[in-house]
Amino acid sequence: MAVPGVRLLTGALRKPDAWTRLWGVIQGTSSHKLCASWNRYLYFSSTKLNTSNYKTLFRNIFSLRLPELLVSPECYFPFSIRLKSNINSKKSTKKTLQKEADEEDSDEETSYPERSEQEEELESEPGVAKDYKDLEKVVQSFRYDVILKTGLDVGRNKVEDAFYKGELRLNGEKLWKKSRTVKVGDTLDLITGENKETGTEVVMRILLKKVYEEKTENDKHRVVLRRWKSLKLPKKTLSK
């Protein structure tokens, strides 16, 4: 019989008018004449109270009217209230904080890309000068004259004149046919000067570094050309 009585009391005390009548009985005044302090209690009862607010309300009532009665808050507050909105709010906040922590961990674990193979190959050739430039170009074919003209940004006539003067080299050897097909890794040299005292020749060099598998809409080849505009090399490497 005690449990149904507690439930009935709990349901009744949740209504604001019940608190009004209860306060009138305790104060010995009419329920319509509310004192200033009652406004605070009415505010608590008309809003969504949590457990701590209910305990505070009971404690204030008993301390005002019955100060000699020392009752533990657990005694005059035998029931508990589960506030779903507060629980959901705490869960949502916890998930948000966990998500932010995961994103920070992901950012810290992100590794930076390693150096390209081109840079590694260049460092493995200590005798090759570093004053080069990599260019992405589009070519119709892999003919020697086409690759050299595109890489050096020179006219076709200049390439033909250099060919007839014997100033073109392919991998250090004299070029005998300007329409010869080149492949990745081949070097194309155009001799621009000679130093007899040092036994060196100055060349403009093109290296076919890479060929992309995907072609353009016009069915042309996309390539990467490495260009040296002025490179000094021993003459013997060009005069085989």
From Swiss-Prot:
One of its GO terms (biological process) is regulation of mitochondrial transcription. Keywords: Mitochondrion, Phosphoprotein, Transcription, Transcription regulation, Transit peptide. Residues 1-83 form a transit peptide. Residues 101-124 have a biased composition (Acidic residues). One of its GO terms (cellular component) is mitochondrial matrix. One of its GO terms (molecular function) is tRNA binding. Its main location: mitochondrion. It is found in: Mitochondrion matrix. The keyword rRNA-binding does not apply. The modification Phosphoserine is found at residues 106, 116. Residues 142-217 form the S4 RNA-binding domain. Residues 92-127 are annotated as: Disordered. Monomer. Interacts with POLRMT. Interacts (via S4 domain) with MTRFR (via C-terminus). Associates with mitoribosomal S39 large subunit, peptidyl tRNA and nascent chain. Mitochondrial RNA-binding protein involved in mitochondrial transcription regulation. Functions as a protective factor to maintain proper mitochondrial RNA level during stress. Acts at the transcription level and its protective function depends on its RNA binding ability. Part of a mitoribosome-associated quality control pathway that prevents aberrant translation by responding to interruptions during elongation. As heterodimer with MTRF, ejects the unfinished nascent chain and peptidyl transfer RNA (tRNA), respectively, from stalled ribosomes. This is Mitochondrial transcription rescue factor 1. It comes from Mus musculus.
